[in-house]
Amino acid sequence: MDTAKVEPPQETKKTILTAQTPLSMSISSLPDEIVLSFLALISKSYYRSLSLVSKSFYSLLSSTEIYAARSHIGATEPCPYVCLWLPKKHRWFTLAEIEGKLSLEPVRLSSSYPRTRVNSTTVAAGTEIYKIGGTVKGKRSRAVFVLDCWTHRWRRAPNMRVSRVGAKSCFLDGNIYVIGGCRKSEEESMNCGEVFDLKTQTWNPLPSPSVNYAVHSNHKVAVSGERLYVITKRNNYAYDPNEGRWLPDVGSVDLQPITGPWSGGIEKVMKPITGRPWKYTWYSSSHRAWQRVMGLDVLYDKRGCGYRTIQLVNYGGKLLIIWSEWIMILDGYSLIRSQEKEIWCAVIRLEERMSYFGPQIWGEVESCNVVVPSVPKSYQLSSCQCVSV
């Protein structure tokens, strides 16, 4: 009987994509304009990995054209910039969020960082971060430096009219407001505050709210709606830019807990939020009352007993919480504090729900993990600003 010759099965070769594969080469052969349009649609969190694919990718992802393209097609996204004061120097990071995991990525500055300034004030405006005033070697400064978050280059901006230390700042309707931080003799004059017009690049004086107005070192500044609020030990004031005047004694509601860099937003309405010793509460401007944020038990369970909330930041309508905890070490049969801390971040999505008792604010923990495993106990969070890039 004839037997058919059976051919042995052929080995299937696996194709491994490398920088030299036809697919990669075909992408590289496309015009930069087309590649740029594709890359602009991808989340910025992946740019660090994509820049390792090829030199052309690195060049495109490092250019200003990629951010211009993202802005043109409406693909911008919020990006928090965190500045940590580590021993003898400042370090800038961006907060990346990939597949529910948060991480701090070092920023490669394209230009030298300005001299270390103690007690300066920092504020985000558009795609830029302004660092204003402070002291250099014990001397007060009027200097203003701007970090372009597209190019990561520092540049000088026009100096303030008055040198300021420990001032507070905020961004409202195309202007940067800087309050306080000047000498007492200047607080009583037209120099208690200044306004920087981004279009004209000029500083203008902001008049004093009242004759007896005095700014203390712990004064606070907040933006709610279309008004600027200044809170001092004695009085609270609101400034209406549209009317160009101060509204005195607006403190019928306790504004002290709602001021600072922390604020959240629901349906584009800014409603400040504050941290209590163990829980977080939300201030409802419509009800003029504080409400406990529900649904955050997962967050509370993760925090240790030695935590300290550093900052709460509006993160594109979500709430970014940054805090530090002592690293505990085992000493015999007990836990003691080490000389180092770890930094945590959490992203909370907030929404308003109706209940039998009325509207409630609920939070859902989207991400929560350690972003810096170890820092010296002397570290400080110099600033956290969220820009749109």
From Swiss-Prot:
<protein>
    <recommendedName>
        <fullName>Putative F-box/kelch-repeat protein At4g35120</fullName>
    </recommendedName>
</protein>
<keyword id="KW-0677">Repeat</keyword>
<feature type="repeat" description="Kelch 2">
    <location>
        <begin position="176"/>
        <end position="225"/>
    </location>
</feature>
<dbReference type="Pfam" id="PF25210">
    <property type="entry name" value="Kelch_FKB95"/>
</dbReference>
<dbReference type="InterPro" id="IPR001810">
    <property type="entry name" value="F-box_dom"/>
</dbReference>
<dbReference type="InterPro" id="IPR015915">
    <property type="entry name" value="Kelch-typ_b-propeller"/>
</dbReference>
<dbReference type="Pfam" id="PF00646">
    <property type="entry name" value="F-box"/>
</dbReference>
<feature type="repeat" description="Kelch 1">
    <location>
        <begin position="128"/>
        <end position="174"/>
    </location>
</feature>
<keyword id="KW-0880">Kelch repeat</keyword>
<feature type="repeat" description="Kelch 3">
    <location>
        <begin position="227"/>
        <end position="273"/>
    </location>
</feature>
<dbReference type="InterPro" id="IPR006652">
    <property type="entry name" value="Kelch_1"/>
</dbReference>
<dbReference type="InterPro" id="IPR050354">
    <property type="entry name" value="F-box/kelch-repeat_ARATH"/>
</dbReference>
<feature type="domain" description="F-box">
    <location>
        <begin position="24"/>
        <end position="70"/>
    </location>
</feature>
